[in-house]
Amino acid sequence: MALIDDARSVLHLDGVTDEGTVTRLNMLIDHGQAYLTGLCGAKLDYESDREAHALLMAYVRYAYNDAVEMFLSNFHDDIFRKQLNVAIALREEEANADQ
């Protein structure tokens, strides 16, 4: 399922296909991806990484409801856990590359 379809489902907008809503959701998805990538310090796979996907959908939900300023404080623990997982994965990649 595409991210836009997931966002529609999370927001209970499954049947909504008007151009304005779709454009807004795509913009929120793009902003969320950029924001989370910046926080985690690496590009995330929002399609297959369940943690990254869940964080992105939460960001979209908060942004859609004009509450994005609450996202970081409400998801601090989840974001921190993702940052640690990304850092560990990057460290392992570096160690494997050095061998």
Regions found by a protein language model. Give the residues of each.
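Conserved short "hinge" loops at termini or chain/domain junctions
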Residues: 1-55, 85-99
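Short linear motifs centered on Gly/Pro in flexible linkers and helix caps
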Residues: 2, 26, 62, 73-74
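Short, hydrophobic/amphipathic alpha-helical patches that form generic packing surfaces
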Residues: 54-66
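C-terminal structural segments of small proteins and small subunits
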Residues: 64-84
